[in-house]
Amino acid sequence: MAAGQPRPPPPPSSVRTERVLRAACAAMAAAGALLLGFSAETKTVIFVQKKAVPKDVQALWVLIVAAAAAAAYHAAQLARCLCMDRLAGGGGGCRRLRRAVACATFLLDKGCAYMVLATTVAALQACFVGLLGVEALQWSKLCNIYTRFCEQAAAGMVCSLVAAAGMAVLSAFSARDLFRRRRPCSPCVQVQQV
């Protein structure tokens, strides 16, 4: 900055909160994807080596992809927030463009939150079979054999659930921003009754 130019005012607390929440959501979703993606354990059972990997449970694989996509989306949105504030200087700009960006952000935030929550719940449901077994189908409890894999998968799913909760809060921030930018209604014309 030049010596004579005033500093731009700091962003409002809601903008700072949104930035922190976006960074936290990106970090938690990335942590969940990494924990699940790198979880693997090999055990030898009766002279046969068997490796447990996330691809064995398709719901885990889908969760890894969804969490990684959500982390990338929130990192990109965080970069957009920082760039838009720097370029616009906190105000001005095209109102129509800002409304369109707010609408797209709202829809994408909602979709991202739903996607991560749905895939996490599906992975939890699939993993409960491995945790508890199904006696009617004679499926044994796999977490007794692959304990480290199950613990790492559980930690990844907890990270994904926390990220999904944060994304739900972020979609509320997006909704507030969208409706704050909407066009005001034209003044109501009062009709006089005769």
Curated annotation (Swiss-Prot):
The entry's keywords: Cell membrane, Membrane, Transmembrane, Transmembrane helix
Membrane topology: Multi-pass membrane protein
Cellular component GO terms held in the UniProt record: plasma membrane
Transmembrane intervals: 28-48, 59-79, 114-134, 153-173
Cited InterPro entries: CASP/CASPL, CASP_dom
Pfam families reported in the protein's UniProt record: CASP_dom
Localization annotation: Cell membrane
Residues exposed to the Extracellular side: 49-58, 135-152
Subunit note: Homodimer and heterodimers.
Homology family: Belongs to the Casparian strip membrane proteins (CASP) family.
Name by which UniProt lists this protein: CASP-like protein 2C2
Species of provenance: Sorghum bicolor
